[in-house]
């Protein structure tokens, strides 16, 4: 992700904090964890007034939907019952919490989180290299020697090309000599791991979606809508309050238990498609993230399909 895109994403997070505070404080006590939002505020200050207004509109659009799904946000049990709004550190994602914004009521030991995205739908950008064991990192099953025997010579060559300062666009054989064999080795390795360990499908989705349930919030500027999507895999979302029930019901979604198919996308040498049971499917597109050749690549991982009981609502901007 470019520095510009990163700043836009952080600015959108800041706009959501502002809008949430404004809407919540009309009903009950709320504070912001100021230290947690320093980076987001810094990014906010780099945006134009037009951009700031756009982020605020995008943030405002989904809040009524959030409140209808989560009555515990507005419920108040006395003056000591205070909502805290905070932004997670980037390092939290490394430990499995993919939520960006967290809404907490410490008095009742309750919190929910939002994963914020601005104009993109990637589930994750995961790096591959000659030393990164994606199997161990993603689903706890180390990659086999047959995988390493294919990919290590490729990344060794890329390291040599980097030392010669070769640009990716000058590497005319990269699809056949780099992308295709790495994706092919990836496909064979995951299929091999699944044969040995049937829990791979659920572990993979847990790696991509984290250890806590959350709502994904995507601002789509061109359409002027904010997509609100539930990932209620453990039943942590949609809790009723003491006196108020949720008016928007969020069902629990089932994790996958089977790999139906893992293969190359038709007519592609750089993208794998994974089809699982219970409605899950994903694409893995390998790409370079730099101008000069380097001995690592990234997978742009996106959901092609999710279970029908993952609720998606398009919230129009005012």
Feature map (PLM): residue ranges:
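Short, positively charged
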Residues: 1-98, 104-111, 115-318
């Amino acid at each position: 992700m470019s520095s510009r895109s990163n700043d836009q994403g952080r600015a959108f997070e800041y706009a959501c904090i502002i809008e949430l505070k404004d809407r919540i404080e009309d009903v009950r006590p709320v504070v912001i964890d100021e230290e947690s939002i320093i980076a987001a505020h810094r990014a906010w200050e780099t945006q134009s007034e037009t951009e700031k207004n756009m982020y605020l509109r995008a943030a405002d659009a989904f809040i009524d939907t959030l409140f209808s799904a989560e009555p515990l946000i507005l419920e108040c049990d006395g003056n000591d019952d205070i909502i805290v709004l905070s932004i997670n550190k980037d390092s939290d994602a490394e430990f499995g919490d993919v939520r960006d914004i967290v809404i907490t009521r410490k008095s009742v030991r309750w919190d929910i989180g939002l994963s914020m995205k601005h104009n993109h739908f990637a589930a994750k950008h995961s790096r591959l290299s000659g030393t990164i064991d994606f199997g161990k990192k993603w689903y706890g099953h180390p990659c086999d020697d047959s995988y390493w025997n294919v990919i290590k010579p490729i990344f060794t060559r890329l390291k040599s090309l980097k030392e010669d300062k070769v640009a990716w666009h000058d590497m005319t054989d990269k699809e056949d000599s780099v992308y295709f064999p790495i994706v092919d080795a990836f496909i064979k390795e995951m299929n091999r791991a699944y044969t040995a360990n049937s829990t791979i499908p659920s572990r993979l989705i847990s790696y991509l979606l984290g250890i806590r349930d959350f709502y994904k919030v995507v601002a789509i500027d061109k359409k002027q809508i904010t997509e609100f999507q539930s990932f209620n895999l453990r039943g942590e979302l949609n809790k009723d309050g003491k006196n108020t029930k949720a008016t928007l019901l969020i069902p629990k979604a089932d994790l996958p238990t089977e790999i139906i198919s893992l293969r190359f996308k038709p007519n592609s040498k750089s993208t794998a498609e994974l089809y699982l049971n219970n409605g899950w499917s994903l694409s893995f597109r390998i790409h370079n993230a730099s101008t000069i050749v380097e001995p690592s690549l990234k997978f742009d991982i996106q959901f092609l399909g999710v279970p029908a009981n993952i609720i998606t609502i398009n919230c129009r901007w005012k």
